[in-house]
From Swiss-Prot:
General function of this protein: Guanine nucleotide exchange factor (GEF) regulating homeostasis of late endocytic pathway, including endosomal positioning, maturation and secretion, possibly through activating Rab proteins such as RAB27A and RAB27B. Promotes the exchange of GDP to GTP, converting inactive GDP-bound RAB27A and RAB27B into their active GTP-bound form.
Family: Belongs to the DENND10 family.
Annotated protein name in UniProt: DENN domain-containing protein 10
Entry annotated with the keyword Membrane: no
Domain uDENN: 1-136
Domain dDENN: 301-357
Location of this chain's protein in the cell: Late endosome
GO biological process entries: endosome transport via multivesicular body sorting pathway; protein transport; regulation of early endosome to late endosome transport
Alphabetic keyword roster: Endosome, Guanine-nucleotide releasing factor
Residues covered by the cDENN domain: 152-299
GO molecular function: guanyl-nucleotide exchange factor activity; small GTPase binding
This protein's GO CC annotations: late endosome
Length: 357
């Protein structure tokens, strides 16, 4: 239990409250501890209370410069002690990706605020979780951090759903992720964007890297600047204008129209060949097997990925300084792989930082 407590102390960063009053104005009301103006503005943008379309999004999550944010928004019933407040959002910031964990905790904080109308009671529960990993209340529900394993969050999405929508084209997404390319996903509904984008890193399970995920972006200068500092990423947008920003992506996924487009500048690195066809067929075959769970499909793809790395092994050598493993490009060329395979292996080595600088 002590390890769990220590972990939560290190993972949770802060809690905040945004209210919308009866005049329709959304305001940042309170936070603990203090936060920066830029993060505050970002979170005001992410909570749906500043949206003009008045659509309520019960829960959204995303990442900004390695800080994860989780926002739960509720409508205030007439019976509540909160007067002149029509809606409010509870915001949690943390170092880890775990939407289910923070959705559960923010829901409890929402119930507490609806009942008492004071941030003090919320802060008590926040500090209890921060220091002990648990908060208990008969009327508002209990929360235990250790119930929410980080690996379960990685496996919560459905690879099968992605394959049923895109079929063989799923291999484009797999290739883009293997090569650490920039993937932008568009859908007008944020829930669809988040469900789809959170699942994609599982296609490269060997990395288990969800820091590449930016599931809720706006075409806002500060956000885009943070995004463009990343080498490869998965970025989700609800603004269709992002399709006119080829500077932001190598692969564009229009989720609403089930279309995947490779940007002209990425076409050379993303050339598909026999190897990609094999990978695509394996992904489709595994995903369409009714006996297999999503985690088994992920396992099948991971095994195929491991096999791809064995293709690189014979052409890899330890660098002269005895440090990292680098690719012997000449040895790769002498193997006379089909051009698309050689091209892919070369770009994969580049993505894995195996090229001699």
């Amino acid at each position: 239990m002590a390890a769990v407590v220590a972990m939560d102390t290190q993972l949770m960063l802060g809690v905040g409250l945004i209210e919308k009053d009866s005049n329709g104005e959304a305001l940042w009301v309170w936070c603990y501890p203090s936060t920066t103006a830029s993060l505050r503005n970002l979170l005001l943008r992410k909570c749906c209370l500043t949206d003009e379309n008045k659509l309520l999004h019960p829960f959204v999550f995303g990442q900004y410069r390695r800080t994860w944010f989780y926002v739960t928004t509720v409508e205030v019933p007439d019976s509540s002690v909160l007067k002149k407040v029509t809606h409010f959002s509870i915001v949690l910031t943390a170092k880890d990706f775990n939407p289910e964990k923070y959705a559960a905790f923010t829901r409890i904080l929402c119930r507490i605020y609806l009942k008492y109308g004071s941030p003090v009671k919320m802060m008590e529960s926040y500090i209890a979780v921060l220091t002990k990993g648990i908060c208990q209340s008969e009327e508002n529900g209990s929360f235990l951090s250790r119930d929410f394993d980080g690996r379960k969050a990685y496996l919560a999405g459905s690879i099968k759903d992605i394959v049923s929508q895109f079929g063989m084209e799923t291999v484009i997404l797999h290739t883009a992720l293997m090569l650490k390319k920039r993937i932008v996903v568009y859908h007008p509904k944020i829930e669809a964007v988040q469900e789809f984008t959170r699942t994609l890193p599982a296609l490269v399970w060997h990395r288990q890297d969800w820091t590449i995920l930016h599931s809720y972006m706006h075409l806002h200068a500060e956000e885009l600047e943070g995004l463009q500092m990343c080498t490869g990423y998965i970025a989700g947008f609800v603004e269709l204008e992002v399709s006119n920003r080829p500077d932001l992506y190598d692969v564009f996924v229009n989720l609403a129209d089930s279309e995947i487009t490779i940007a002209p500048l990425a076409k050379e690195a993303m050339t598909m060949g026999k190897l990609h066809k094999e990978i695509g067929q394996l992904i489709v075959q595994s995903a369409e097997d009714p006996e297999k769970s999503d985690s088994q499909v992920i396992q099948d793809i991971a095994l195929k990925t491991k096999e791809i790395f064995t293709h690189l092994a014979p052409f890899s050598e330890v660098s002269d300084d005895g440090g990292k493993v680098i690719l012997n490009v000449e040895a790769l060329k002498q193997q006379r792989f089909p051009p698309a395979t050689e091209n892919f292996l070369y770009h994969l080595a580049a993505a894995e930082q195996m090229l001699k600088v």
